[in-house]
């Protein structure tokens, strides 16, 4: 069999058949996914906040449901079978290489297999069982949580939206005392309030290890913050939007970790799912491209954090950590760690023996607004993670595993180039590489679609696309996968050719059309640190933290 397209390229009926069968297949996949998102009308509620919370609970049940696991597994197998059928029907067996460079090109097909380890780890999430829910979910706990937002201070609109989203959600899901810390490089015009502290990093501030960028700001915050050592810190970016399910997930995680701490264990560091649909209407293409990140959260990263072992890095946003654990490892990571300070810090925490965990709920953020920022964002990640692998004070095995993932990231990008080139050469492909590549591709199709499903299903009903528009998004999600893969590869190749030398900050708008991901609440309120809910209880709202199937 052959993965090239020389036969179809010379016979237009083959191309038409390929496109037609592909579209029918994609529509079928979209309908299957849409079927899982339909909610019974009898569960509809009248109050916006309760309706949003119940919708969250149903999504949680869907993701945890055994049938949904089988649906995703079926999508992987079904997609692979369809690929094999299309190859057998539309393509010839390919030709053998005649020149040395053709033999070299043929061997490049094995690069398809480079993504197999990451795909396998992601697939492990299908067999992991979610932890049991605590019996006292919803009970108010007297543990202060500080939402720490780090920004350059240039986008006041985004900061204002983030602060408002925290207050809106905490006014409804009042599960713990809270405060907000905004860490900026310049003065910002945020209205003073009892629940808000603005920390301005002095322009002449220098850390002992010469850390830069966000690492410098975080180190300053840990030095001057007045948080109690047993308080908790939730890290988010300037455009982050907190949701109801996330507040519940934070509450559950803090309660569980405080129980472990009382038994003599070190509280673990938590992370969860991030959605990127805030600008779906304004920037649908790049939002679809970031469906992979959400799908990766609920698969590969879920496997990592549920196992408690750090092996593929950590996001810089959605980090939940107790203050004394956070300050035990300095964010003064030096120039080498300043590009991806989050992962550098996390690997040093792992070296100290600190464990990791999954946190229910999701944080809403936005995708890059243009192709240049998209590629440069990926370049920063790739360059920074290599510095982590080379310089982080972590165990050798942990650094080697990270190097393996980073090498596979590059090689899989090369495999994408091979696919394009072989469209014109028509070389035969070794069947093991073909089978492995087909399975990897099928897994990524499922990951993209699952990420999109979760993102759309978590949007409030009034902002969610119509059934027809959603169907179009699912079809576009798969049809544009070669484009998305090229964008991801461009970031990696850019990192190899011109490694990140600074800290590229992508442009983010202020107010977004996406609004709150899981509610339509308009009321704004705040809870001052140390205040207590009546009778020690949260408001009587039937909610549940949003989870993935493995969290």
Write out the residue ranges for each language-model feature:
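Catalytic beta-strand/loop signature of glycosyltransferases that borders the donor
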Residues: 271-273, 356-363
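Acidic donor-binding loop at a coil-to-helix junction in glycosyltransferase catalytic cores
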Residues: 337-345
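Juxtamembrane C-terminal module of membrane proteins
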Residues: 27-68, 79-87, 106-144, 168, ...
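Cell-envelope/extracellular polymer assembly enzymes that use nucleotide-activated donors
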Residues: 143-148, 179, 344
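Active-site donor/metal-binding and catalytic loop motifs
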Residues: 359-373
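Short, acidic, metal-binding catalytic loop of nucleotide-sugar glycosyltransferases
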Residues: 162-177
């Amino acid at each position: 069999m052959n993965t090239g397209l020389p036969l179809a390229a010379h016979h237009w009926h083959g191309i038409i058949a390929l496109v037609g069968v592909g579209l029918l297949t994609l529509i079928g996949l979209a309908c299957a996914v849409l079927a899982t998102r339909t909610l019974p009308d009898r569960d509809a509620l009248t109050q916006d906040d309760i309706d949003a919370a119940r919708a969250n609970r149903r999504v949680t049940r869907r993701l945890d449901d055994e049938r949904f696991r089988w649906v995703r597994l079926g999508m992987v197998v079904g997609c692979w079978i369809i690929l094999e059928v299309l190859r057998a029907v539309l393509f010839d067996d390919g030709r053998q290489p005649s020149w040395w460079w053709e033999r070299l090109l043929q061997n490049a097909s094995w690069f398809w297999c480079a993504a197999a380890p990451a795909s396998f780890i992601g697939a492990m999430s299908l067999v992991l069982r979610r932890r049991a829910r605590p019996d006292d979910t919803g009970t108010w706990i007297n543990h202060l949580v500080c939402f720490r937002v780090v920004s350059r201070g240039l986008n006041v609109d985004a900061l204002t939206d983030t602060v408002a989203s925290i207050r809106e959600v905490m006014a409804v899901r009042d599960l713990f005392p809270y405060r907000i810390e905004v860490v900026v490089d310049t003065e910002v015009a945020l209205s003073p309030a009892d629940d808000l502290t603005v920390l301005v990093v002095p322009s002449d501030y220098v850390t002992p290890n010469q850390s830069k960028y966000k690492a410098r700001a975080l180190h300053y915050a840990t030095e001057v913050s007045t948080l109690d050592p047993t308080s908790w810190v939730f890290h988010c970016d300037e455009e982050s939007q907190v949701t109801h399910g996330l507040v519940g997930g934070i509450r559950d995680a803090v309660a569980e970790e405080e129980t472990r701490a009382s038994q003599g264990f070190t509280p673990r560091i938590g992370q969860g799912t991030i959605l990127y649909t805030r600008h779906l209407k304004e920037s649908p293409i790049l939002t679809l491209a970031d469906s992979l990140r959400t799908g990766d959260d609920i698969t590969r990263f879920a496997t990592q954090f549920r196992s408690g072992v750090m092996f593929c890095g950590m996001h810089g946003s959605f980090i939940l950590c107790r203050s004394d654990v956070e300050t035990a490892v300095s964010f003064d990571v030096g120039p080498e760690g300043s590009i991806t300070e989050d992962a550098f810090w996390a690997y040093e925490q792992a070296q100290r023996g600190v464990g990791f965990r999954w946190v229910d709920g999701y944080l809403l953020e936005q995708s890059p607004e243009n192709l240049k920022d998209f590629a440069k964002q990926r370049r920063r990640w790739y360059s920074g993670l290599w510095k982590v692998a080379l310089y982080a004070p972590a165990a050798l095995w942990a650094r080697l595993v990270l190097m393996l993932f980073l090498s596979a990231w590059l090689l899989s990008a090369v495999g994408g180039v091979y696919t394009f080139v072989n469209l014109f050469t028509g070389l035969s492909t070794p069947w093991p590489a073909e089978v492995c590549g087909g399975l990897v591709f099928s897994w990524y199709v499922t990951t993209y679609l699952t990420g999109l499903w979760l993102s759309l299903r978590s949007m409030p009903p009034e902002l969610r696309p119509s059934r027809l528009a959603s169907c179009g998004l699912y079809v576009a999600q798969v049809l544009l996968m070669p484009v998305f893969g090229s964008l991801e590869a461009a970031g990696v190749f850019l990192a190899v050719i011109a490694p990140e030398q600074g800290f590229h900050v992508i442009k983010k708008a202020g107010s977004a059309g996406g609004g709150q991901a899981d509610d339509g609440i308009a009321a704004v309120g705040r809870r001052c640190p140390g205040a207590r809910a009546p009778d020690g209880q949260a408001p009587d709202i039937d909610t549940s933290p949003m989870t993935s199937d493995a969290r």
